[in-house]
């Protein structure tokens, strides 16, 4: 068997449907967005979109419609999934808890029936009498909407028009009436039928129209007063209602195909239309009032409003604001203006929502050399094409920086009385202190009355009773704010120097060697309340009040030298409440008591970058739940700051980290800065909600990203990226991309828009010795679009396009690798191509081109003609392995810098994917699943070891380990095949056994080994081995990792228990959702644990957790079993969440 854990690192981001209505209450205007399996619910507010809830569906959302049956005060939601689960959902809120109730559900799949090529269509009668579904050719399925029906029952009506393009219910008809566009051998036609619920039959509709435009593809039902329907084609827009027929053919819509529409007004007088190029149009219906008071349509008009992301769906919200949902680029919130701008556009982008989809290719690189992978993806398509750099961590955006070496501490001050923003920054150096005044964004050095500037400051801040405090090694100085002068000074009775200190607004804690002093701050006075001597020297201490800023802390935390301990003492009496031996020889350097999400913690950082953290009981001072993580390699300084009204901790070190709490568990997110020695929060007029950070040489002021797990940076290319690879020696990426050009009258072609390949710093064009002249006997005609393919060389730091190389006419780039070949020390970029002509079923010729990039120049070193398309290439033991149509071929690199064929393997339909490990080669075929080859170096040939005999249409493959091979196929499933080395017969050995099956519900385009997280974070490492990331069409990033059998069995047990406790939205069974499903077969999932379900354990209430673990046995580490506690399982699941 093979045991794997699959989990989401980034949820899908591509929007495939959006609707607006009153779902959460009758007064709220809601926007609902479907992102494959996820449903996001927002309320539209004057400030923008406010997220209300996100729901994970056990299915791919195929249809999503709001409707309001009679007797309901707010809208209900109808959802149909790709596996034909239908449900009607209602929003229920009681207090803080939000529930999505399933009012009715059912599965509407037919045992037989051919799924329609134009996909699933779901529509609801405007009078809410029925739901209509077109799932299969020749059938129209009806779900009657009866009020108290808990089960959705459906019946089919035969539809003699087999090929339906689009269908809608018409408004205000006595009986429910459908209007549809269909195709037959004569062309496309429009027809209407009435649906009879009693007879379960169609009867003749009110009107029909034969021979509409050949490309007619969309029906829009128009409400009263007009009624009827609008038919949208490639070149024309027509209106019908039985008596009236009106057609227009505006040239403006011909350039591209309209793909989505949305009604603006309730009376249907304006519609938004979006096309494949991202243009947004307004369709206006002009009315004419008749003598008898009725309204008829006078004219149709189309106006171009401007450009948006390429829209998959549009929805008009309110006040001229439109949500543009995109699958190929970022989604947007745009405002329509009454006046156009200089470019003639009426569209203003208000907000952008990141979308990584479609992820076509990706690679993992450690650019910052911090031992952490970053994922660089080829995302989007056409004008939305981009590279996305995805890092696990938090970004700091620099707003100002000053060269100031040697900073030893920094603190914000509000010097002027009664200010609520900081106006001063105090910086401490060895032997001196400097004060910077902040006015707006200007910074200048000043002096502060009552402060000393010839000593190093240990702490400085605003304290109670409108006073400031400065603590140096010599004394504690209390300064009044108004007038500003020294009012009290405390010195150590024997005149010894203060070694460490901590201070809040009313208390001061100081250590002088082993002696602790406790002072309280009063108006104009520092009062020493108590002192005590510890058995060792004090290394660090903290007196942060956990009740809030103005309260007294009844506890203090101390870290000691010599015995390496952390202690909790009471104040003011210094009674020892808890002593925790940290072990080892590294002293604690920073200690901090803090609260996250109303849970109290003690954090203690050591001099080697390790951090211990404990739960702290503030009543007893006891520590529990000891855990340890490694944050860096140098001493760490802990400081709290607030961001978006939550408390976070910044750990300053060589690997700066933000510590925050999510769902009551601590998350450690690294920050995109090389090194931070000291930091403090800063909230001044010129720099609101900022952080001041110091490293060895510089002071930086910046703002911090939203505290979240993944940080995404976008590099727009404005053309389609296809493949990416990284070349360390030249510190750049190679990217294959294609742009669209339009054929002009002279036979040449010109780009549609500026993009990465037309704006590079330098460029070159292929001229092949192999294909002389234009190889194109296939002429393209004037105005036709052609694809132009390029290799882009992109700088790894600035992401600037340094060079672009344009390939031949009709030459498509398919594969790319950066590698060294043979004994040649040079690292090359190698590109595989195909000559693509419209009249050839598959390419008959292509090239492998070897490039060298050096000092800003790209040279063609070698090219090799091949008889087919070079679908995939990998470096293989110093040679080049390529798959060309159905052949797998190995090339060696000669001393003359030429590619020479060494051996071939021919037994494939179309070899699309190659992965290698040692001498083994995994081949992914178009339709014949996967095949394992071994290269025999002595004989110089390939041997076929084993293959999977199941017909899987592959989309990506990866080698997990020597015996296990991972595949993704085109029905959104994952599977694992295993090599059976122990089999007794040759025949059994030649079969790869399918030992893992899982329905992912995502189309995987690429697998690659690598991880997004720092390795070795926890003390107990998670029970997983290896890490394979994958990227999907919907922009999801997932991870597959392997488990031991005992861990698999434990998690499988937990998974089954969770399924009993967690109720799914729409009442879809988890086992049904995850079962491996193709047109040929459905089999239960096996060999995979659903990590998303396991992680949801952390989000359920404690009583529910208790229910899950009842009588669950866990291994105590010595091979003995014992009953699991809730905290045991929380710890296990938390460890698992840290792998992504």
From Swiss-Prot:
Residues 709-1043 are annotated as: WD repeat beta-propeller C. Residues 391-708 are annotated as: WD repeat beta-propeller B. Its main location: cytoplasm. One of its GO terms (biological process) is regulation of circadian rhythm. It holds the Pfam family Beta-prop_RSE1_1st. Gene3D superfamilies: 1.10.150.910, YVTN repeat-like/Quinoprotein amine dehydrogenase. Keywords: Biological rhythms, Cytoplasm, DNA damage, DNA repair, DNA-binding, Nucleus, Repeat, Ubl conjugation pathway. GO terms for cellular component: Cul4-RING E3 ubiquitin ligase complex; Cul4A-RING E3 ubiquitin ligase complex; Cul4B-RING E3 ubiquitin ligase complex; cytoplasm; nucleus; site of double-strand break. It is found in: Cytoplasm; Nucleus. InterPro entries: Beta-prop_RSE1/DDB1/CPSF1_1st, Cleavage/polyA-sp_fac_asu_C, RSE1/DDB1/CFT1/CPSF1, WD40/YVTN_repeat-like_dom_sf, WD40_repeat_dom_sf. Pathway: Protein modification; protein ubiquitination. SUPFAM superfamilies: WD40 repeat-like. One of its GO terms (molecular function) is DNA binding. Residues 13-356 are annotated as: WD repeat beta-propeller A. Protein, which is both involved in DNA repair and protein ubiquitination, as part of the UV-DDB complex and DCX (DDB1-CUL4-X-box) complexes, respectively. Core component of the UV-DDB complex (UV-damaged DNA-binding protein complex), a complex that recognizes UV-induced DNA damage and recruit proteins of the nucleotide excision repair pathway (the NER pathway) to initiate DNA repair. The UV-DDB complex may recognize UV-induced DNA damage and recruit proteins of the nucleotide excision repair pathway (the NER pathway) to initiate DNA repair. Belongs to the DDB1 family. Component of the UV-DDB complex which includes ddb1 and ddb2. Component of numerous DCX (DDB1-CUL4-X-box) E3 ubiquitin-protein ligase complexes which consist of a core of ddb1, cul4a or cul4b and rbx1, and a substrate receptor, such as CRBN. DDB1 may recruit specific substrate targeting subunits to the DCX complex. These substrate targeting subunits are generally known as DCAF (DDB1- and CUL4-associated factor) or CDW (CUL4-DDB1-associated WD40-repeat) proteins. PANTHER family: DNA REPAIR/RNA PROCESSING CPSF FAMILY. This is DNA damage-binding protein 1. It comes from Xenopus laevis. The lineage of its organism: Eukaryota, Metazoa, Chordata, Craniata, Vertebrata.
């Amino acid at each position: 068997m093979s045991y794997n854990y699959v989990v989401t690192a980034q949820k899908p981001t591509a929007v495939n449907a959006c609707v607006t209505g009153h779902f959460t209450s009758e007064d709220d205007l809601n926007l609902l967005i479907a992102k494959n399996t996820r449903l996001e619910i927002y309320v539209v507010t004057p400030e923008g979109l406010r997220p209300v809830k996100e729901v994970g569906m056990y299915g791919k959302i195929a249809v999503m419609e709001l409707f309001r049956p009679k007797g309901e005060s707010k809208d209900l939601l109808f959802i149909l999934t790709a596996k034909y689960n239908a449900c009607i959902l209602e929003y229920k809120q009681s207090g803080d808890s939000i529930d999505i109730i399933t009012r009715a559900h059912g599965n509407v799949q037919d045992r037989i029936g051919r799924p329609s090529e134009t996909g699933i269509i779901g529509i609801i009668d405007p009078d809410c009498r029925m739901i209509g579904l077109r799932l299969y050719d020749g059938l129209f399925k009806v779900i009657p909407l009866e009020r108290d029906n808990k089960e959705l029952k459906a019946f089919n009506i035969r539809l003699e028009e087999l090929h339906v393009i689009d269908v809608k219910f018409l408004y205000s008809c006595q009986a429910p009436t459908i209007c549809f566009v269909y195709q037959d051998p004569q062309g496309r036609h429009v027809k209407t039928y009435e649906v009879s619920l009693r007879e379960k039959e169609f009867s003749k509709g009110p009107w029909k129209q034969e021979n509409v435009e050949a490309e007619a593809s969309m029906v829009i039902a128009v409400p009263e007063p007009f009624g009827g329907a609008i038919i949208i084609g490639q070149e024309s827009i027509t209106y019908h209602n039985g008596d009236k027929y009106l057609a227009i053919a505006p040239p403006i819509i011909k350039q591209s195909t309209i793909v989505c529409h949305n009604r603006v007004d309730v009376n249907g007088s304006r519609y938004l239309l979006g096309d494949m190029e991202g243009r947004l149009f307004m369709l206006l219906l002009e009315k004419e009032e008749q003598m008898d008071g009725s309204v008829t349509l006078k004219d149709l008009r189309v106006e171009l409003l401007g450009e948006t992301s390429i829209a998959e769906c549009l929805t008009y919200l309110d006040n001229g604001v439109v949500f543009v949902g995109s699958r190929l680029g970022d989604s947007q919130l745009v405002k329509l203006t009454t006046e156009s701008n200089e470019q003639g556009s009426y569209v203003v982008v208000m907000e952008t929502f990141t979308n990584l989809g479609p992820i076509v290719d990706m690679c993992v690189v450690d650019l910052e050399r911090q031992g952490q992978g970053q994922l660089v993806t080829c995302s989007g398509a056409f004008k939305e094409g981009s590279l996305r750099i995805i890092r696990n961590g938090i970004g700091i955006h620099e707003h100002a920086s000053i060269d100031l070496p040697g900073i030893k501490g920094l603190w914000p001050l509000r010097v002027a009385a009664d200010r609520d923003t900081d106006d001063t920054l105090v910086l401490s150096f060895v032997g001196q202190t400097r004060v910077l005044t902040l006015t707006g964004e200007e910074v200048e050095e000043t002096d502060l009355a009552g402060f000393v500037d010839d000593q190093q400051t240990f702490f400085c801040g605003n304290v109670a009773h409108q006073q400031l405090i400065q603590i140096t090694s010599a004394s504690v100085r209390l300064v009044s704010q108004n007038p500003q002068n020294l009012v009290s000074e405390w010195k150590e009775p024997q005149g010894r120097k203060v070694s460490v200190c901590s201070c809040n607004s009313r208390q001061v804690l100081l250590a002088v060697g082993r002696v602790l002093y406790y002072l309280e701050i009063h108006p104009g006075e520092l009062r020493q309340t108590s002192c005590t001597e510890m058995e060792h020297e004090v290394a660090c201490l903290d007196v942060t009040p956990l009740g809030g800023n103005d309260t007294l802390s009844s506890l203090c935390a101390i870290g000691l030298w010599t015995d390496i301990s952390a202690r909790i003492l009471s104040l003011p009496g210094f009674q020892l409440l808890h002593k925790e031996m940290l072990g080892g020889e590294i002293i604690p350097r920073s200690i901090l008591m803090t609260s996250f999400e109303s849970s109290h913690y003690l954090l203690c950082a050591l001099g080697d970058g390790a951090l211990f953290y404990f739960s702290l009981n503030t009543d007893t001072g006891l520590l529990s739940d000891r855990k340890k993580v490694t944050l860096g390699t140098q001493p760490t300084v802990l400081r709290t700051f607030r961001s978006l009204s939550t408390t976070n901790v910044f750990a300053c070190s060589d690997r700066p980290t933000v510590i925050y709490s999510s769902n009551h568990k601590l998350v450690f997110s690294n920050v995109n800065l090389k090194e931070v020695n000291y930091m403090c929060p800063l909230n001044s007029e010129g720099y609101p909600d900022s952080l001041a950070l110091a490293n060895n040489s510089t002071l930086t002021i910046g703002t911090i990203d939203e505290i979240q797990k993944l940080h995404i940076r976008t590099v727009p290319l404005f053309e389609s990226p296809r493949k990416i690879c990284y070349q360390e020696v030249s510190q750049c990426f190679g990217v294959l991309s294609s742009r669209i050009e339009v054929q002009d009258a002279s036979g040449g072609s010109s780009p549609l828009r500026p993009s990465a390949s037309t704006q590079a710093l330098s460029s070159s064009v292929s001229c092949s010795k192999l294909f002389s002249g234009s190889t194109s006997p296939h002429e393209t005609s004037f105005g036709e679009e052609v694809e132009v393919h390029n290799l882009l060389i992109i700088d790894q730091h600035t992401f600037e396009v340094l060079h672009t190389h344009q390939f031949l006419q009709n030459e498509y780039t398919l594969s790319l690798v950066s590698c060294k070949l043979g004994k040649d020390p040079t690292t090359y970029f190698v590109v595989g191509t195909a000559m693509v002509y419209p009249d050839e079923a598959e390419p008959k010729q292509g090239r492998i081109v070897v490039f060298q990039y050096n000092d800003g120049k790209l040279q063609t070193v070698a090219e090799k003609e091949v008889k087919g398309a070079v679908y995939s290439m990998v470096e293989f033991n110093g040679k080049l392995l390529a798959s060309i149509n159905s052949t797998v071929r190995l090339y060696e690199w000669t001393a003359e810098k030429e590619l020479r064929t060494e051996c071939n393997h021919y037994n494939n339909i179309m070899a699309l994917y190659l992965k290698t490990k040692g001498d083994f080669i995994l081949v992914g075929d178009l339709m014949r699943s996967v095949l394992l080859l071994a290269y025999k170096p002595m004989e110089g040939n390939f041997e076929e070891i084993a293959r999977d005999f199941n017909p899987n249409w592959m989309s990506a493959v990866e080698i997990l380990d020597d015996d296990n091979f991972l595949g993704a196929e085109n029905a959104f499933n994952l599977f694992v095949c295993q090599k059976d080395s122990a089999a007794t017969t040759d025949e059994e050995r030649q079969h790869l056994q399918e030992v893992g099956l899982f329905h992912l519900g995502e189309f995987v385009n690429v697998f690659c080994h690598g991880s997004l997280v720092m390795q070795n974070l926890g003390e107990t490492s998670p029970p997983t081995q290896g890490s394979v990331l994958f990227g999907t069409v919907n922009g999801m990033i997932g991870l597959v990792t392997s488990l031991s059998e005992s861990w698999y069995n434990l998690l499988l047990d937990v998974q089954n228990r969770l399924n009993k406790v967690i109720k799914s939205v729409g009442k879809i069974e988890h086992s049904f959702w995850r079962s491996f499903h193709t047109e040929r077969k459905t089999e239960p999932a096996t060999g995979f644990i659903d990590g998303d379900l396991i992680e949801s354990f952390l989000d359920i209430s404690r009583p529910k957790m208790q229910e899950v673990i009842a009588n669950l046995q866990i291994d105590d580490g010595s091979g003995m079993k014992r009953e699991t506690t809730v905290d045991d399982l929380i710890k296990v699941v938390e460890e698992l969440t840290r792998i992504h």
